């Protein structure tokens, strides 16, 4: 591309997309932030909602594509916004960004407070929704459900996780220091992290020195239950188990065989941390059980496993799975298999049916010419694979003694796939105690060892242990209870938050609290935010900051 065409392209590019910092002199001369175009349907959805500035920031942010790992345009919008307010920003090599706002009023000489949220969002859509998350804006809608007022999206994730936290931080940065009657604010260090949703990668690579972070109190705005304060979270890590297999074309001899699919579907699935204590069914494990039962019912040499697959995300309980088996082409063999699957389905309904009302386990004949050319696993390989799946820990392993009802340690058997020479199983383990997490991962290693396989484990990210002497907890609890008129909930969450990693990066002496407005259905097209909780949430943030502004 010629220099002229590059310049022409740059001239046509909106300011919020330009990479690199615009000079302070340009803004001093009267330059104005050029925000992204907010779709008319989104404007209609947020009309009249308070606080208006926060909703405007959220709508603008939602008009900029920001999938995990591709947050550049949103980050550039934040930079341009900061410069339009004559605020300084710094970034590190990972793309994390910090914007600095001086304190106002009596808070001018107070210690800085870090306001933190992540910029990226989960990108999920309904199968009948035409939406490109790399280019299209989120289209919002306003509706009433269960007598509550909600803002959601039209067939996609909304991005309130964590767009609400980012919008709140931008609203704080944008408060006019000369506003009459405004609450005093301490110096604010607004930290915007990247690539949170795919494994906390931005927080893991955060460079506190490059970002100029000095605050020793942090408000994480990435929780979704208004009225509760969160003081701890689980750490976690993935284990990729690989089990060698052998395929044998002659396992069924010279007999004619047909193909059958054993399929499990209709399960609820859900988050592998937040929902793990509910006892939801795991599609992979139910499929392993049903397949094992089917092979045993057929009898030696009369059925063999060809393939198995299920699950697609490390942090989701598998909703469905299927196995393909080769079966001798006799009516008696097929009937024995179908009867065994009916019995397995009945047993599963007895175990899970009150919760998993959509659960289905079925066996049906299929015709797939490609699969006829796939040699089945030999009997030993199939037995080792299915036995290993059923031996792996799944669900809550231990509950907390300190916070009754809170899962302390868990494991999720997240996915399985069978290739030519090996089967791969992904597990996601969590614990708020580091040693318990590693003990769980060691159990996974032991199962893999007994199956003749190996394990590659990701570096575990740390949990966040509750601090009973937390000053920010005392202040937040008092102020929240004054606002609510009743006792505030103090909780920990069995899921990964950036807080654990950020404490490691910013120093163990940092004091942290996490909270947010009410958001339901996060990570799905059902995601929605209770609009009536947004104003009190933002006012509460200001209450905390006003209190800290007086702490010299």
Which residues does each PLM region occupy?
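His/Asp/Glu-rich mid-to-C-terminal helical/loop segments that flank catalytic regions of hydrolases
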Residues: 210-211, 279-300, 329-334, 380-390, ...
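Fold-level recognition of mixed alpha/beta catalytic cores in primary-metabolism enzymes, strongest
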Residues: 184-283, 287, 291, 295-296
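Zn-dependent metallopeptidase/amidohydrolase metal-coordination segment
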Residues: 46-54, 401, 408-423, 428, ...
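Active-site metal-coordination/substrate-binding segment of hydrolases
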Residues: 107-209, 214-216, 238, 379-382, ...
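A short beta-alpha structural unit
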Residues: 59-63, 311-314, 324, 360-376, ...
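N-terminal mitochondrial targeting presequence
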Residues: 1-34
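Acidic/His- and Gly-rich active-site-bordering loop/insert found
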Residues: 32-150
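A conserved active-site cap/scaffold subdomain adjacent to cofactor or substrate pockets
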Residues: 314-395, 399
């Amino acid at each position: 591309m010629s220099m002229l065409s590059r310049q022409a392209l740059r001239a046509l590019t909106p300011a919020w997309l330009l990479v690199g910092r615009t000079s302070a002199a340009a803004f001093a001369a009267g330059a104005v932030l050029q925000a992204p175009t907010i779709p008319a349907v989104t404007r209609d959805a947020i009309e009249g909602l308070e606080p208006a500035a926060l909703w405007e920031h959220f709508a603008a942010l939602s008009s900029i594509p920001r999938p995990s790992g591709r947050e550049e345009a949103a980050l550039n919008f934040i930079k341009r916004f900061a410069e339009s307010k004559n605020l300084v920003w710094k970034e590190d090599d990972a793309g994390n960004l910090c914007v600095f706002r001086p304190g106002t009023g009596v808070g001018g000489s107070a210690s800085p407070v870090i306001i933190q949220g992540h910029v990226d969002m989960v990108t999920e859509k309904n199968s009948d929704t035409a939406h490109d998350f790399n280019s299209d804006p989120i289209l919002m809608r306003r509706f009433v459900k269960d007598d509550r007022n909600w803002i959601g999206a039209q067939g996609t994730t909304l991005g309130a996780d964590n767009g609400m936290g980012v919008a709140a931080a931008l609203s704080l940065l944008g408060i006019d220091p000369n506003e009459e009657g405004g609450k005093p604010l301490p110096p604010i260090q607004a930290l915007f992290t990247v690539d949170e949703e795919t494994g906390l990668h931005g927080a893991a690579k955060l460079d506190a020195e490059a970002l100029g972070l000095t605050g020793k109190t942090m408000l994480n705005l990435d929780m979704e239950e208004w009225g509760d304060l969160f003081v701890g979270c689980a750490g976690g890590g993935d284990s990729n188990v690989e089990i060698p297999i052998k395929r044998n074309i002659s396992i069924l001899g010279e007999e004619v065989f047909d193909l059958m699919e054993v399929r499990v579907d209709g399960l609820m699935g859900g988050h592998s941390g937040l929902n793990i204590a509910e006892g939801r069914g795991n599609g992979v494990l139910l499929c392993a059980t049903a397949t094992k039962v089917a092979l045993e019912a057929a009898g030696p040499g009369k059925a063999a496993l060809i393939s198995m697959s299920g699950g697609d995300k490390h942090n989701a309980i598998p909703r469905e799975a299927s196995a393909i088996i080769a079966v001798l082409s006799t009516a008696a063999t097929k009937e024995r298999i179908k009867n065994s699957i009916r019995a397995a389905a009945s047993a599963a309904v007895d175990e899970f049916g009150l919760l998993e009302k959509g659960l289905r386990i079925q066996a049906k004949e299929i015709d797939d010419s490609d699969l006829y050319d796939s040699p089945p696993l030999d009997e030993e390989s199939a037995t080792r694979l299915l036995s290993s799946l059923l031996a792996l820990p799944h669900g809550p392993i231990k509950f907390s003694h300190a916070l009754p009802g809170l899962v302390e340690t868990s494991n999720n058997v997240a996915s399985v796939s069978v290739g030519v020479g090996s089967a791969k199983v992904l597990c996601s383990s969590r614990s708020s105690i580091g040693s318990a997490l590693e003990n769980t991962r060691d159990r996974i290693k032991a199962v893999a060892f007994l199956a003749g396989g190996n394990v590659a484990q990701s570096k575990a990210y740390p949990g966040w242990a509750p601090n009973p002497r937390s000053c920010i907890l005392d202040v937040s609890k008092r102020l929240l209870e004054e606002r609510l008129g009743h006792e505030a909930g103090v909780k920990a969450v069995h899921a990964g938050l950036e807080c654990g990693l950020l404490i490691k990066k910013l120093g163990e002496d940092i004091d942290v609290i996490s909270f947010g407005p009410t958001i339901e259905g996060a990570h799905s097209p059902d995601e929605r935010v209770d609009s009536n909780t947004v104003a009190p949430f933002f006012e509460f943030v200001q209450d905390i900051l006003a209190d800290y502004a007086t702490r010299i």
